[in-house]
């Protein structure tokens, strides 16, 4: 909600996201072999074909849409998207963003997906199913974003001293 309430934050965030998603991208093969060249070309054609409205799966994001969605990690510190695979493992349709609230870090700094059977702890994420992007260098991914310092900045710029002290006293927030 912070970008909705503070136009300067919204403007800076939009500028950064547009700069990231506006950059060009290309794939390079891992080595000079014909097999690596073919794999890189096949992946590029798969990425170019992503993004559509699937009748059963709903809206599927394209690769530039994935890059834009993963830039959501700027504020909360992490972002994730599901890879929507084609049947039989022959390529993929595209990507579907997953909101941050569906992840749990209760047991460790490794993300776990919250499901109906595992609401608090979450369950382990299957390999090759989710792309997870985090901004922090080790440590807690939830604290890696810009949301905490921006919340303090917003609080100090919008509330007078009396209201801030009243809020801190009422909700027991330590003043750090």
Predicted regions located by residue number:
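Structured, contiguous alpha/beta core segments that scaffold functional sites
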Residues: 18, 29-30, 35-176
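N-terminal-proximal low-complexity accessory segments that begin disordered
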Residues: 1-22
């Amino acid at each position: 909600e912070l970008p909705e309430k503070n136009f300067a934050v919204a403007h800076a965030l939009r500028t950064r996201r547009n700069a990231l998603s506006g950059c060009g991208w290309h794939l390079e093969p891992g080595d000079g072999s014909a097999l690596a060249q073919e794999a890189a070309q096949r992946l590029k054609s798969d990425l170019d074909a992503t993004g559509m409205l699937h009748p059963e799966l709903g809206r599927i994001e394209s690769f530039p849409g994935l890059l834009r969605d993963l830039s959501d990690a700027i504020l909360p510190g992490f972002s994730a998207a599901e890879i929507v695979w084609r049947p039989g493992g022959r390529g993929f349709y595209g990507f579907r963003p997953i909101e941050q609230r569906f992840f749990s870090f209760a047991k460790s700094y490794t993300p776990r997906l919250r499901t109906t059977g595992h609401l608090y702890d979450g369950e382990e994420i299957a390999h090759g199913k989710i792309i997870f992007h985090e901004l922090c260098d080790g440590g807690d991914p939830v604290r890696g974003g810009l949301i905490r310092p921006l919340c303090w900045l917003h609080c100090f710029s919008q509330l007078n001293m009396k209201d801030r002290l009243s809020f801190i006293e009422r909700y027991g927030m330590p003043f750090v």
